[in-house]
């Protein structure tokens, strides 16, 4: 959440605490830890939108793996979402599905390949663009973009450009992200 000038955020103690944290820090992460490793939302997306200019919701994690296909109950995209960004790590390209993908059986089904299949830029683009993959649950009124992350080496950058080209052929805009060498190891934006 990023701070907003709006003060119409409700009167509950939680909403007051969120508002105070936003005013003090400008950026706040909200959620409740459950099952030891999961984070659940804190308040409805509509309530959070009244408190902040921007609300980012992680609707579908990948267990820290660079690529995935969602389960039948994923992703949990709030109906009020304006935009959805599917994220893929470029370290997945050139690696076997069974090694770098969360829910590899679903990835294999979408690609028509086995767990030993080595992912190509076309595979990554197909997974991101698929209504059963990265585009799953995206409403027609929602903007859809892809973030091609971890393009930190020349080879990964080339893979990212290839994936971006394949996505562009499908009318999907993407952004390529990476750290420069001097930014690695401890960069904190906030």
Q: What name fits each language-model region?
A:
Residues 29-32, 55-59, 65, 86, ...:
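General beta-strand structural signal in soluble alpha/beta enzymes
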Residues 1-32:
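N-terminal phosphate/diphosphate-binding loop that engages ATP/GTP or pyrophosphate donors
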Residues 24-28, 50-55, 83:
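Loop/turn-to-beta-strand initiation segments
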């Amino acid at each position: 959440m990023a701070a907003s000038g709006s003060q119409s955020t409700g009167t509950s103690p939680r909403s007051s605490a969120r508002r105070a944290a936003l005013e003090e820090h400008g950026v706040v992460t909200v959620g409740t830890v459950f099952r030891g490793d999961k984070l659940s939302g804190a308040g409805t997306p509509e309530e959070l939108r009244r408190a902040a200019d921007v609300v980012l919701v992680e609707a579908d994690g990948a267990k820290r793996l660079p690529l995935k296909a969602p389960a039948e109950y994923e992703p949990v995209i709030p109906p009020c979402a304006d935009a959805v960004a599917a994220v893929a790590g470029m370290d997945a390209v050139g690696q076997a599905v069974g090694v770098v993908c969360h829910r590899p059986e679903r990835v294999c089904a979408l690609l028509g390949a086995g767990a030993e299949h080595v992912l190509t830029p076309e595979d990554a683009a197909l997974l991101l663009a698929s209504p059963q993959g990265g585009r799953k649950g995206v409403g027609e009124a929602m903007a859809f973009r892809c973030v091609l992350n971890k393009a930190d080496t020349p080879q990964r950058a080339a893979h990212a450009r290839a994936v971006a080209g394949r996505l562009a052929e499908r009318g999907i805009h993407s952004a390529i992200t990476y750290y420069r060498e001097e930014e690695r190891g401890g960069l904190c934006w906030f």
